[in-house]
Amino acid sequence: MSKRTFQPNNRRRAKTHGFRLRMRTRAGRAILASRRGKGRASLSA
């Protein structure tokens, strides 16, 4: 039997999909801008 692929880890989640990571690149800032435009309740992990 193989284990489940999703092994929750808050630190890894923040480091790979977090707000500060999104702000780091131009593309990431574009993602945040589009999510703000859509009116998302949460912008990032």
Curated annotation (Swiss-Prot):
The keyword Ribosomal protein applies. GO terms for molecular function: structural constituent of ribosome. Pfam families: Ribosomal_L34 (PF00468). One of its GO terms (biological process) is translation. Keywords: Ribonucleoprotein, Ribosomal protein. The keyword Ribonucleoprotein applies. GO terms for cellular component: ribonucleoprotein complex; ribosome. Belongs to the bacterial ribosomal protein bL34 family. This is Large ribosomal subunit protein bL34. The gene is rpmH.
